[in-house]
Amino acid sequence: MTRKSFPFFLLGLILTVGIDQAVKYWVMHNIPLGTETPLLPFLSLYHVRNSGIAFSFFSSFSHWGLIFLTLIILIFLLWLWKNTQYNKSLTRFGFTLIIGGAIGNLIDRICFYYVIDYILFYINDVFYFAVFNLADTFITLGVIAIIIEELLSWIKRKSTFSE
């Protein structure tokens, strides 16, 4: 990590956590728990509480156990961000999104003992995806960003070796 990159990292965290928490606040105060608000033929806002992690995994863990697990993962992610080469900007951006999303969900878990989820994708009455939130979306987009940069690096290395 360089001093030059830290302000961008901090700004990214402030934006991801701030947007996530603002939307969750709006959902909590405008959509009753367990109520679905259709937006599009395949998308609804559906206010639920998730006591686990993604897809309700680890929902049998204690409240403090999940907080501890999240903190350990955050420390590891911060270490990865800090030790990622400066020229790997997409990877660094990906880690920023992942860390911001994890912090957003950690705030919920500390304050409410659960995570506020509200995004529901579905196809008619045939398929319903797990309800999730914007923090989960940031985490997913961060992983995708890292995978893209790794694939591009791999393709570049492969083409360099074959020449």
UniProtKB/Swiss-Prot annotation:
Highest taxon listed in the record's lineage: Bacteria
Gene: lspA
GO molecular function, one term: aspartic-type endopeptidase activity
Protein name stated in the entry: Lipoprotein signal peptidase
Regions crossing the membrane: 8-28, 61-81, 93-113, 128-148
Alphabetized Pfam families for the sequence: Peptidase_A8
Entry's Gene Ontology BP terms: proteolysis
Keyword vocabulary terms for this entry: Aspartyl protease, Cell inner membrane, Cell membrane, Hydrolase, Membrane, Protease, Transmembrane, Transmembrane helix
A GO cellular component annotation in the UniProt record: plasma membrane
Species per Swiss-Prot/TrEMBL record: Bartonella henselae (strain ATCC 49882 / DSM 28221 / CCUG 30454 / Houston 1)
Function: This protein specifically catalyzes the removal of signal peptides from prolipoproteins.
Location within or outside the cell: Cell inner membrane
Listed EC numbers: 3.4.23.36
